[in-house]
Amino acid sequence: MTKHYLNSKYQSEQRSSAMKKITMGTASIILGSLVYIGADSQQVNAATEATNAPNNQSTQVSQATSQPINFQVQKDGSSEKSHMDDYMQHPGKVIKQNNKYYFQTVLNNASFWKEYKFYNANNQELATTVVNDNKKADTRTINVAVEPGYKSLTTKVHIVVPQINYNHRYTTHLEFEKAIPTLADAAKPNNVKPVQPKPAQPKTPTEQTKPVQPKVEKVKPTVTTTSKVEDNHSTKVVSTDTTKDQTKTQTAHTVKTAQTAQEQNKVQTPVKDVATAKSESNNQAVSDNKSQQTNKVTKHNETPKQASKAKELPKTGLTSVDNFISTVAFATLALLGSLSLLLFKRKESK
């Protein structure tokens, strides 16, 4: 008996079910992507409409200028206030748009106003347009075409109030507080083109950059003078920063001060006779011999110090040689270790 997973019928069923699953998964993915794309496009359209709406509104407002104006509705043939005045919002507004003038007013209880007509002084009917009809607030905004200089308008209305069974037609006249003024033209919006940023151009090097040279500070030796009298025969002793050379300078300083003292004695004592001159020359010779002996002693003392300095120098050459030998030895050991591992693996494989 063959197992069920070796049966050809079972295998074909498994293939068909797998194909169905793949097809359903692909279809669901495509459908989901289409839904997502559609929702995204709707959001983009809504965003563009939202951005265009204020732009259009601002364009319309910018093309029109307005000014408030007060008025009163009076009964026909008298200056008595009419009840119609209570059903209109005050003040009104004079609007100039596209070089045309309009008187704009808002009617309260708009559902009561079944008919309204406006006439000028020559009994010519004026065009009336509805700007906004708010059913919820029961108000209606209308524009009546007028001309600058109009002082009053004649109105004929038909009012119906079902609650009190009121249905009446009557004529009134609308008196402006002042004549319709002449308004200035609206400032046209400047179409400012967006400034496109220019690509930054690389600056051409005008001057070659010079390498920065390290500054070398010159050490100025300090000069110590023996006395003020030594104008012609001044002795200068250079003092260094190291403490080991101070002994050398001190010995040289003592020797030279002795010589300068003797020379001063020579200058101060006048030459009276040959005997005194000879005695002075003998004294000078003796002092010179002493100074030479002291110089030899100081040089002899300096030689062990110089030798000690030579001993203190670092062995840079030896350390570099030692490092090279150690690296070569380490590399050789590593190579031998790798070769031994390779031979060991070959033996194991055999």
Swiss-Prot record:
Residues 203-214 have a biased composition (Low complexity). Residues 1-46 form the signal peptide. Induction: Repressed by fur in the presence of iron. Residues 317-350 form a propeptide. Residues 252-268, 278-296 have a biased composition (Polar residues). It is found in: Secreted, Cell wall. Pfam families: Gram_pos_anchor, NEAT. Residues 188-314 are annotated as: Disordered. Monomer. Interacts with IsdC. Interacts with IsdB. Belongs to the IsdA family. This is Iron-regulated surface determinant protein A. It comes from Staphylococcus aureus (strain COL). The lineage of its organism: Bacteria, Bacillati, Bacillota, Bacilli, Bacillales. The gene is isdA.
